[in-house]
Amino acid sequence: MAEETMENEERVKLFVGQVPKHMTEIQLLTLFREFSIVNEVNIIKEKTTRAPRGCCFLTCPTREDADKVINSFHNKKTLPGASSPLQVKYADGELERLEHKLFVGMLPKNVSETEVQSLFSEYGTIKDLQILRGSLQTSKGCLFLKYESKEQAVAAMEALNGRHIMEGANVPLIVKWADTEKERQARRLLKVQSHVSRLDPQNPSMFGALPMSYVPPYNGYGYHVPGTYGYMLPPIQTQHAFHNVISPNQGNGRALQGTALTESVPPRLAPRRNFPTALGNYGYHGLQYPMAFPRGMIPPRLPLTTVSPGISNNGTSIPSSLQTEGPAGANLFIYNIPREFEDQELAATFQPFGKVLSAKVFVDKATGISKCFGFISYDSQAAAQNAINTMNGCQLSGKKLKVQLKRDNGQQQQQQQSKNPLFNGLLNS
């Protein structure tokens, strides 16, 4: 049993693009085995139709066998029915896994390479160690290191990750497998998936489903499975009290005109600060959403045009320079955002109150960890005010949100001038 497990860990997975859709797994296996040892081939198919997507994974017993396949086929052989040569590369994360490469974060900025060597060498032989530094050669508080074997890397992770605090730091070390940007994107999307259920056509979403890809493309060669996630409510027709409660916005900014909660509403939906509480366990854990939002129920599938380019569809952070500002009084500052939230989650949370032009969660450049604050921009002041009235003080994942208008430079300058006696004297004269 142990030998079988070790054999599986040594296997190497390759991604192959530009595969003719008419070819079968047996045909591909025969082709690749002419040049190297290949254990199996798995054609990647559409999730719903099961039609081939023109790419596949293949598994080799060792890295040497995998390199033979890459050297023999990558950009060198065009199969009948294909327009371009085969693209053969390591699947995402394989190189990092094979090299036993670790990422270490939350290091003191003044840590030396000798200190790190001394700590991590207790768990095995270090082949390579690289402290990440900025333009002024100052440490970013993180590093990459490689061990001689996987067992040594695992031992270091188990002993140090979240448990050891280095001298000069106030938080434990983060020790994990190094990953690629594509893997980080996939992890963000999976994190979103853990908060929500899959969208069902019979169950409309309160927030709609922000279009996003299920997993990122492998090596950029077309393996891209489309998918959406929505925040589901129970079927509307089964909620007998809903027609007495939910009233769409008619343009006057009031969503609860002349409506009241009836006795038929379950206790868990009783009013709280003039808003009903969250419906069951849907939506984000810990956030008490109102049943009636200022803009009423939003369709389950929002078109891409309703979200500005400032909100990425693949889960990556967008630089502040690309932020889309709303009109004066329509931009919000959000504090105490849950640490696991990113741009997409923030946008989805504030989408019910109006058209979101952009959403940004600020992260530490060195560690990639959220700073727990960000900004939301709406297309109108009314939407921003509705968001403040509803969300300020709400509990979200155990944190009490602080939602207020973002101060622009003009307001700050005016406030500073108003405090200046000379400026006040000129006004009075």
From Swiss-Prot:
Its main location: cytoplasm. RNA-binding protein involved in the regulation of flowering time. Acts as a repressor of the activity of SOC1, a transcriptional activator of flowering time. Binds to the 3'-UTR of SOC1 mRNA in the cytoplasm and participates in SOC1 mRNA decay, mediated by the distal region of the SOC1 3'-UTR. Expressed in roots, stems, flowers and siliques. Residues 410-429 are annotated as: Disordered. InterPro entries: Hud_Sxl_RNA, Nucleotide-bd_a/b_plait_sf, RBD_domain_sf, RRM_dom. The keyword RNA-binding applies. Keywords: Cytoplasm, Flowering, Repeat, Ribonucleoprotein, RNA-binding. This is RNA-binding protein BRN2. SMART domains: RRM. The lineage of its organism: Eukaryota, Viridiplantae, Streptophyta, Embryophyta, Tracheophyta. It comes from Arabidopsis thaliana. One of its GO terms (biological process) is regulation of photoperiodism, flowering.
